[in-house]
Swiss-Prot record:
Belongs to the cytochrome P450 family. GO terms for molecular function: all-trans retinoic acid 4-hydrolase activity; heme binding; iron ion binding; monooxygenase activity; retinoic acid 4-hydroxylase activity. This is Cytochrome P450 26A1. A cytochrome P450 monooxygenase involved in the metabolism of all-trans retinoic acid (atRA), a signaling molecule that binds to retinoic acid receptors and regulates gene transcription. May regulate at-RA signaling during hindbrain development. Mechanistically, uses molecular oxygen inserting one oxygen atom into a substrate, and reducing the second into a water molecule, with two electrons provided by NADPH via cytochrome P450 reductase (CPR; NADPH-ferrihemoprotein reductase). The lineage of its organism: Eukaryota, Metazoa, Chordata, Craniata, Vertebrata. SUPFAM superfamilies: Cytochrome P450. It comes from Xenopus laevis. GO terms for cellular component: endoplasmic reticulum membrane. Keywords: Endoplasmic reticulum, Heme, Iron, Lipid metabolism, Membrane, Metal-binding, Microsome, Monooxygenase, Oxidoreductase.
């Protein structure tokens, strides 16, 4: 066989599969676009639909932030794609996001990807709708009342101080992100589920934390439950978590609750009993898992970002310490120490600005998911009924007209109150509308306690400098933020 014949054969062998792939991709796009609403004259947003069935999920999962940045630069604030098995429109920008968040029940409804719904379960607050969501949220909200938060502060302080002291004794390198996750996990177990973390040995704690990590990594995956798939691994981790939580729930059902301070899980149990309903163990496990996931994952992300920004901006750290000194909080001597309380924490105005600026630049949750209840028009484009809508928090913060020099860390920008008009949707770290994060005040108080304990006890430096960040699905440093801690001696 001569060289020409070999080359021709090789080209045909390569060209045929490529041609079939391109043809399949084109037919897939035609199929997806036929789902547009013919009764609406407005066009679909620009964008591409990827490969048959997979859409652009694989690219998004593998490339994460890079994928979103490229799409944003190519197509602008609104574009179409195909993610997690559904045609999807991704939305950025304060005014566009405002219409989505304020359109709950009218234009859109919460609708997480199938993998998230399967792993977290139908009984968790994020997946409930209408009256069921309303009543469950009202019950859980009691765990985040001002009275409840006031009772949490001493326990938060105890757990944070214990962790900070451990870092000071841990030698030349502490991996900050895993250490903070462990701390926030203990706090969430103690305050939200009423479980004493002291009863769990280190091995059990690590196993449960690893299970949460595995579940978190695989929350957003293709809805294919086969061995070694993302959904399969996520469900296996979820089942391990449920088994541990079930033991805690059964113990809780057998003992008398503290009438003065009830955790969120106890409130859900009491709600079922008051209504004469049988205890739904599966729903309680799903609610408890969601509370633990939201209660430690997002706060750990924010606290890690705070640690990073304060280390990189010594002028801001000095301002925080001056505020602590003004409030009598800088000294760690027992005879001079002022007791932390919710009233004292609310006086820390500049510290609040630092937390807000951290949440602006590094919001723990990148966005939220909705589904169109009917076809509607957004900024000139049609969003067909049944299509998923993802609104972006991080990108909206990054381009908000509300903030000059959006890429600069400047807490002073929050010393002036935000306007109450639609531009306020340029800052939405906790979402907005009726689906606004139920635990946002809990998170704010916890982050303030963390800043107080960190800044009055420690000096620290980042061993790798400014960290690269990734989203999986919560924003976190790629290198786990290695740092060196040493005791702080007040000289202000």
């Amino acid at each position: 066989m001569d060289l020409y014949t070999l080359l021709t054969s090789a080209l045909c062998t390569l060209a045929l599969p490529l041609l079939l792939l391109l043809t399949a991709a084109k037919l897939w796009e035609v199929y997806c676009l036929r789902r547009k609403d013919a009764a609406c004259a407005n066009p679909l947003p620009p964008g591409t639909m990827g490969l048959p069935f997979f859409g652009e999920t694989l690219q998004m999962v593998l490339q994460r932030r890079r994928f979103l940045q490229v799409k944003r630069s190519q197509y602008g604030r609104i574009y179409k794609t195909h993610l997690f098995g559904s045609p999807t429109v991704r939305v950025t920008g304060a005014e566009n996001v405002r219409q989505i968040l304020m359109g709950e029940h009218k234009l859109v409804s919460v609708h997480w990807p199938a993998s998230v719904r399967t792993i977290l379960g139908a009984g968790c607050l994020s997946n409930l709708h209408d009256n069921e969501h309303k009543y469950t949220k009202k019950v859980i909200a009691q765990a985040f009342s001002r009275e409840a938060l006031a009772n949490y502060v001493p326990q938060m302080e105890e757990e944070v101080r214990c962790s900070v002291n451990l870092w000071l004794q841990s030698g030349p390198c502490v991996l900050v992100y895993p250490a903070i996750k462990r701390m926030m996990f203990r706090i969430a177990m103690r305050l939200l589920l009423g479980c004493d973390p002291q009863r769990m040995d280190r091995e059990q704690e690590e196993t449960l934390l690893e299970a949460f990590e595995e579940m978190s990594r695989n929350l957003f995956s293709l809805p294919i439950d086969v061995p070694f798939s993302g959904l399969y691994r996520g469900l296996r981790a979820r089942n391990l978590i449920h088994a541990q939580i079930e033991e805690n729930i059964k113990e809780k059902l057998q003992r008398e609750p503290d009438e003065h301070c009830k955790d969120a899980l106890q409130l859900l149990i009491d709600y079922s009993r008051r209504n004469g309903e049988p205890i739904n163990l599966q729903a309680l496990k799903e609610s408890a898992t969601e509370l633990l996931f939201g209660g430690h994952g997002t706060t750990a992300s924010a606290a890690t970002s705070l640690t990073s920004f304060l280390a990189l901006h010594k002028d801001v750290l000095e301002k925080v310490r001056k505020e602590l000194e003004t409030q009598g909080l800088l000294s760690t001597k027992p005879e001079e120490k002022k007791e932390l309380s919710i009233e004292v924490l609310q006086q820390l105005k500049y510290t609040s600005c630092v937390i807000k600026e951290t949440l602006r630049l590094s919001p723990p949750v990148a966005g939220g998911f909705r589904v169109a209840l009917k076809t509607f028009v957004l900024n000139g484009y049609q969003i067909p009924k049944g299509w998923n809508v993802i609104y972006s928090i991080a990108d909206t913060h990054g381009e908000a007209d509300l903030f000059p020099d959006t890429d600069k860390f400047n807490p002073d920008r929050f010393l002036t109150p935000l306007p109450r008009d639609s531009s306020r949707f340029g800052f939405i770290p906790f979402g907005g509308g009726v689906r606004c994060c139920i635990g946002k005040e809990f998170a704010k108080i916890l982050l303030k306690v963390f800043v107080v304990e960190l800044c009055r006890n420690c000096d620290w430096e980042l061993l790798n400098g400014s960290p690269a960040m990734t989203t999986s699905p919560i924003i976190c440093p790629v290198d786990n933020l290695p740092a060196k801690f040493k005791p702080f001696s007040s000289s202000i």
